[in-house]
């Protein structure tokens, strides 16, 4: 079966884990190159041992590799600031490249596979939001398909040890991009995102809490929609699960909640508690936050590649 070649820009935790996933499980994709800026990085050393072409000279080095002309997909696992420069540079050389953006740059449309992948199959650049967004936006969208969502707030708690320099450099972009995507894809009128780097030792796996305030709705229908969505996410992130039963609170008109920017609102408050365990391909199992990003990005590119090969 013909496979499309990919390059991964960023040889840190996310880029290296993504490379391992493609090497082990790529169905329509195969590795073409791993790109970094640190010649001593573990990711580049590992890639070289596995027979993958490497460069420590960034996207300029990628463009000079003999196989650059055969690359169909580029995964960018650098930083938001770097991606804003990488996209026009690469597209200037190869206009037809597909870029999968794993930074919070959001040059292209947000993509959460279980919610809106099919709408984005032909996009030249898609943004994978953030780890917190990939974990929680499906839950907001699950409530949205049952009732109108006024407000959604998510809290993503990740092990401090799983947050590399790229994640730490993008904390502000994380909250901004996730909040916007909660609205754009999740369907909330207003979204808010909070990230917590948990320093506990031994490290704890990723935990996410989702609070949704919606119009009044049938609780059984909401719970069923959430369970169905969680199962869909498990299709590409097996370690994704509801940690406990969904909790509901009816907010009466007589005692509404005051939501900044929206005013006083009543309705149904839904609380969802998630945990995400990583597949431990390259990263430890507690780094579910990184695993859900690489898994979502791979699922997106695989579906795009399938569509391109079948065209």
From Swiss-Prot:
Catalysed reaction, written as an equation: acetaldehyde + NAD(+) + CoA = acetyl-CoA + NADH + H(+)
Residue numbers annotated as active site: 131 (acyl-thioester intermediate)
Binding site for NAD(+): 11-14, 162-170, 289
InterPro entries, alphabetized: Acetaldehyde_dehydrogenase, Acetylaldehyde_DH_C, NAD(P)-bd_dom_sf, Semialdehyde_DH_NAD-bd
Entry's Gene Ontology BP terms: catabolic process
Keywords on record: Aromatic hydrocarbons catabolism, NAD, Oxidoreductase
UniProt-recorded Gene Ontology molecular function terms: acetaldehyde dehydrogenase (acetylating) activity; NAD binding
Keyword NAD carried by entry: yes
E.C. numbers: 1.2.1.10
Family the UniProt entry places it in: Belongs to the acetaldehyde dehydrogenase family.
Entry protein name: Acetaldehyde dehydrogenase 2
Organism in which the protein naturally occurs: Azotobacter vinelandii (strain DJ / ATCC BAA-1303)
Gene: mhpF
């Amino acid at each position: 079966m013909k496979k499309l070649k990919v390059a991964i820009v960023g040889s840190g935790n996310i880029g290296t884990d993504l490379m391992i996933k493609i090497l082990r499980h790529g169905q329509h994709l195969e590795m073409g190159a791993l790109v970094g800026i640190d010649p001593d990085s573990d990711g580049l050393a590992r890639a070289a041992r596995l027979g993958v072409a490497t460069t420590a000279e960034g996207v300029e080095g990628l463009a000079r590799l003999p196989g650059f002309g055969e690359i169909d997909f580029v995964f960018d696992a650098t930083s938001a600031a770097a991606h804003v420069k990488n996209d026009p540079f690469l597209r200037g050389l190869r206009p037809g490249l597909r870029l999968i953006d794993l930074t919070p740059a959001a040059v292209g449309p947000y993509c959460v596979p279980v919610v809106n992948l099919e709408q984005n199959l032909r996009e030249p650049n898609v943004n994978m939001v953030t780890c917190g967004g990939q974990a929680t936006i499906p839950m907001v969208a699950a409530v949205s398909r049952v009732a109108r969502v006024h407000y959604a707030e998510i809290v993503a708690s990740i092990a401090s040890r799983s947050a590399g320099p790229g994640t730490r450099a993008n904390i502000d972009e994380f909250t901004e991009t996730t909040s916007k995507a909660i609205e754009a894809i999740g369907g909330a009128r207003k979204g808010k995102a909070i990230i917590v780097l948990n320093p506990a030792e031994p490290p704890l796996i990723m935990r996410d809490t989702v609070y949704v305030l919606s119009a009044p709705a049938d609780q059984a229908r909401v719970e069923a929609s959430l369970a169905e969505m969680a199962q869909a996410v498990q299709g590409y992130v097996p370690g994704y699960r509801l940690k406990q039963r969904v909790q509901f609170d009816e907010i009466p008109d007589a005692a509404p909640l005051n939501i900044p920017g929206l005013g006083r609102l009543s309705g149904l408050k839904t609380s969802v508690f998630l945990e995400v365990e990583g597949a431990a391909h390259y990263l430890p199992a507690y780094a579910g936050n990184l695993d859900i990003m690489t898994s979502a990005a791979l699922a997106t590119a695989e579906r795009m590649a399938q569509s391109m090969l079948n065209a």
